[in-house]
Regions:
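Short loop/turn motifs enriched for small/polar and acidic residues
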Residues: 68, 111-117, 153-155
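A short glycine-enriched loop-to-beta-strand structural element that forms part of the catalytic core
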Residues: 19, 104-121
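Catalytic NTP-binding/metal-coordinating core of nucleotidyl cyclase/transferase enzymes
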Residues: 4-81
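Acidic/histidine metal-binding catalytic segments
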Residues: 66, 102-108, 148-152
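Short, solvent-exposed loop/turn segments at secondary-structure junctions
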Residues: 72-73, 119-121, 157-158
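Intrinsically disordered, glycine/charged-rich C-terminal tails and inter-domain linkers
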Residues: 1-6, 10-13, 145-199
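Catalytic-core segments of nucleotide cyclases and related cyclic-nucleotide turnover enzymes
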Residues: 118-144
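Alpha-helical scaffold within the catalytic cores of cyclic-nucleotide enzymes
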Residues: 42-60, 71-110, 131-140
């Protein structure tokens, strides 16, 4: 049995600090039940392609997608870009061309986390491993439709942003495998008229 185990790296593996954006399509199972399979497949293909292009336009790197969920990452010092990408995704998906033709209104849940990870290519695809990746999945699952939640590290990293504002959730959020998380924030884009008043 021991012969089947992969050897550990002989030298320390380099880690990096990164931000992760996870977005998930609300109600995708219901859509899969309602739509003909070819329509559903075409919708998901357009959905995923849109998010790939949107996240890359904001400087992110898409790591993977699993059906109705997409995960991307940014260097930790680009937390503002990561949050803006997550927020912009809501509007872009709501305007998805094929969804409009099918008479559908699409909504997302989103989350942004940050921390230490290891990245590398597995099977030709870039992957990331570390607690922030798992946290992003769980935090996204805890968001309400239309909501983008961020952890305290991300909120702190964006504190000086003139384009973002954050509201602390009124109650702790219970997340599977993480327990009760007290400092979770909802991210919002600052409206232009508010920016003009500040200026």
């Amino acid at each position: 049995m021991a012969d089947l185990l992969l050897p550990l790296a002989s030298s320390p593996v380099a880690t990096q600090q990164a931000c992760f954006v996870m977005v998930d399509l609300v109600g995708s199972t219901v859509l899969a039940q309602r739509l003909p399979v070819d329509h559903y497949a075409a919708l998901m293909a357009e959905f995923v392609q849109l998010l790939y292009l949107s996240f890359e336009a904001h400087g992110g790197c898409v790591l993977q997608h699993q059906g109705d969920a997409v995960l991307a990452f940014w260097p930790q010092d680009q937390a503002e870009a990561a949050v803006l990408a997550a927020l912009d995704a809501h509007g872009r998906v709501a305007r998805l061309r094929l969804a409009g033709l099918l008479g559908l209104s699409l909504r997302l849940r989103g989350a942004v986390t940050s921390g230490e990870v290891i990245t590398g290519h597995i099977g030709g695809q870039l992957s990331a491993y570390g607690l922030p990746v798992n946290f992003a999945r769980r935090l996204c699952g805890g968001a309400q439709p239309g909501q983008t939640l961020v952890c305290q590290i991300v909120q702190s990293g964006c504190a000086a942003s003139a384009r973002l504002e954050f509201g602390l959730l009124g109650e702790p959020l219970e997340l599977r495998d993480f327990g009760e998380i007290c400092e979770v924030y909802e991210a919002r884009r600052v409206l232009r008229d508010n920016q003009m008043k500040v200026g």
